From Swiss-Prot:
GO cellular component: cytoplasm; ribonucleoprotein complex; ribosome
Organism: Leptospira interrogans serogroup Icterohaemorrhagiae serovar Lai (strain 56601)
Signal peptide span: none
Record carries keyword Metal-binding: no
Domain of life the protein comes from: Bacteria
Protein name: Large ribosomal subunit protein bL36
PANTHER family: 50S RIBOSOMAL PROTEIN L36, CHLOROPLASTIC, LARGE RIBOSOMAL SUBUNIT PROTEIN BL36C
A single GO molecular function term of this UniProt record: structural constituent of ribosome
Lineage: Bacteria, Pseudomonadati, Spirochaetota, Spirochaetia, Leptospirales
Keywords from the named record: Ribonucleoprotein, Ribosomal protein
GO biological processes: translation
Amino acid sequence: MKVRTSVKKICSSCKVIRRKGVIGVICTNPKHKQRQA
């Protein structure tokens, strides 16, 4: 899990999601998981 100020899709299977106002990226590759700080 990476915490970043700006979250971006890294590959084609990355999805930008919003949960309770928190923007994040979920992917099949665990290295691509991101959350916005």
